[in-house]
């Protein structure tokens, strides 16, 4: 590995004791603080699973697939990274074991190892290190934060941990920092904090040759100085380098909690970087203050097929929250399983919703429930927002119930439909890598609701779809002067946005606007949708101080 020209610093974040400790949130929070200190920060996630990417994984297994501008299908943690940092990630920001092994095997087939026996060490570990270096170069980062997926001790993580162990030796002590997150359980019955799991986790990490310089302790109660000193002594760590990550009601509070513990000072001192810029994170303080003092409440019905696992729609939920906070409003997501929605209960389930959102999805299961929800929103004049598959089904619903095209459908659902209003252009037997992915241009119709919302005529949005509105049906839809294709991609002439002129707020988009929404910069479509939902029942529209 050639590191002579490498100027980036690297923070490697590992986790111990249990999974789902919040390593991604810790990484994003530290990144936010360091960015506010004036450094160019990027974050990378190393996932130890053998899948090439999460694109073909079940939402029930993995949650949301987050799509980057350059078309990578990635872990949902990248959504946290982008929202906390307000920086775009890339394909180099999420590396899986599958990608690493595929790359090494391809090189072996091409003869690039000159007949050597290909092994985990050095070939797999070298490939991992190259991917880390590439992320630093692609993003031109001063500081790269690298989150290692999984838990220390998992067999899948072993090559990644060995690679980051070697990394410090090759780039230098003051260019690498190891941060370990662990759970510190609190036994309520005994009213006692237990440190043994943390001790064992650090011991296991040290046995792999990695001595963490920072510990971040996840706990439901504050950890006193005596406990921290005990952990420091037994884990051979500076007591000043032990920080706590308390359970919080507001996710963004973690940024302030770590900042107030001065974690950035310890990091910058270790890296021997300038540490004289004073910051106060006032925008984030204002956001948290706003969330703690919300005046109104809006109810959004989210009609989906994966609602059992809310993480399947994580970015949509966060985007709705961003927009609601912009209007000084709390938000209640009413989770509605489209498989259980039918003509006898649709009114009961949707009547109290201020707005209805039908999100993405794949396959024929539970689509009729979604179509019923769309019809109800259209006929009852309830603000409606369709995203990706939600747009496609809005087209199907309109074709069936307004244009009376009997049997109209998507060819994804019915290949023999007499009216294929939604079709697929790319035909491939494999599911992986065949989607239209990444950021594409969309031109907006002048004097349309879309143009009014965006306040511009050309936008770029991220996509993840295989099917699209059939161009040969567009003129038929627009004949009745209600249905409007208000956004289209000029390169492929694809319908990107539809809206109904005679409805208070009925819009559906082929792209995924939720991937571009930020806590301090809500996406314009979500803002407009939430505003319409608030207005539906005459609720007070008052922008927060964030606007």
Curated annotation (Swiss-Prot):
Pfam annotation, one family: GATase
List of residues binding CTP: 19, 154-156, 194-199, 230
Annotated positions binding Mg(2+): 77, 147
Glutamine amidotransferase type-1 domain mapped to chain residues: 306-539
Pathway per the UniProt entry: Pyrimidine metabolism; CTP biosynthesis via de novo pathway; CTP from UDP: step 2/2
GO cellular component: cytosol
Protein name: CTP synthase
Source organism of the structure: Phytoplasma australiense
Name of the gene this protein is made from: pyrG
């Amino acid at each position: 590995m050639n590191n002579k020209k490498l100027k980036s610093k690297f923070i490697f974040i590992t986790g111990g004791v249990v999974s789902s400790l919040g390593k991604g949130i810790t990484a994003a929070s530290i990144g936010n603080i360091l960015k506010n200190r004036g450094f160019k920060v990027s974050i990378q996630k190393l996932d130890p699973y053998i899948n090439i990417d999460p694109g073909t994984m079940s939402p029930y297994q993995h949650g949301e697939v987050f799509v980057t501008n350059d078309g990578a299908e990635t872990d949902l943690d990248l959504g946290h990274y982008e929202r906390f940092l307000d920086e775009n990630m890339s394909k180099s920001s999420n590396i899986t074991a599958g990608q690493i092994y595929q790359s090494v095997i391809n090189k072996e087939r091409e003869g690039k190892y000159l007949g050597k026996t290909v092994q985990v060490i050095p070939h797999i570990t070298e490939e991992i290190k190259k991917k880390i270096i590439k992320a630093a170069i692609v993003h031109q980062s001063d500081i790269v934060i690298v989150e290692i997926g999984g838990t220390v001790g998992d067999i899948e993580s072993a090559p990644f941990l060995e690679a980051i162990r070697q990394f410090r030796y090759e780039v230098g002590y003051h260019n690498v920092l190891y941060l370990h997150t662990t759970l510190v359980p609190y036994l309520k019955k005994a009213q006692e904090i237990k440190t043994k799991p943390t001790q064992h986790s650090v011991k296991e990490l040290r046995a792999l040759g990695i001595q963490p310089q920072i510990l971040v302790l996840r706990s439901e109660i504050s950890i006193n100085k005596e406990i921290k000193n005990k952990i420091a002594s037994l884990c051979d760590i500076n007591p000043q380098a032990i920080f706590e990550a308390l359970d919080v009601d507001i996710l963004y509070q973690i940024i302030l909690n770590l900042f107030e513990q001065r974690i950035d000072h310890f990091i910058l001192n270790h890296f021997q970087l300038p540490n004289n810029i004073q910051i106060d994170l006032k925008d984030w303080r204002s956001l948290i203050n706003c969330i703690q003092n919300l005046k109104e409440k809006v109810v959004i019905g989210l009609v989906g097929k994966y609602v059992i696992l809310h993480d399947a729609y994580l970015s949509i939920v966060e985007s709705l929250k961003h927009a609601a906070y912009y209007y000084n409003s709390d938000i209640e997501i009413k989770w509605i399983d489209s498989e259980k929605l039918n003509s006898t209960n649709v009114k009961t389930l949707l009547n109290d919703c201020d707005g209805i959102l039908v999100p993405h999805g794949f396959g024929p299961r539970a689509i009729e429930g979604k179509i019923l929800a769309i019809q109800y929103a259209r006929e009852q004049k309830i603000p409606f927002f369709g995203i990706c598959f939600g747009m496609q089904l809005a087209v199907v619903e309109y074709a069936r119930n307004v244009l009376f095209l009997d049997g109209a459908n998507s060819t994804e659902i019915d290949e023999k439909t007499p009216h294929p209003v939604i079709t697929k252009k790319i035909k491939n037997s494999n599911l992986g890598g065949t989607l239209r992915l990444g950021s594409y241009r969309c031109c907006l119709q002048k004097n349309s609701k879309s143009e009014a919302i965006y306040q511009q005529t050309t936008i770029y949005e991220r996509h993840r779809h295989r099917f699209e509105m059939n161009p040969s049906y567009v003129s038929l839809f627009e004949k009745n002067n209600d249905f409007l294709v208000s956004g289209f991609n000029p390169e492929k002439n694809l319908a990107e946005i539809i809206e109904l002129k005679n409805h208070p707020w009925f819009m559906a988009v082929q792209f995924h606007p939720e991937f571009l929404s930020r806590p301090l910069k809500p996406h314009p479509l979500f803002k407009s949708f939430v505003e319409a939902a608030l207005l539906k029942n005459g609720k007070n529209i008052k922008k927060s101080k964030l606007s």
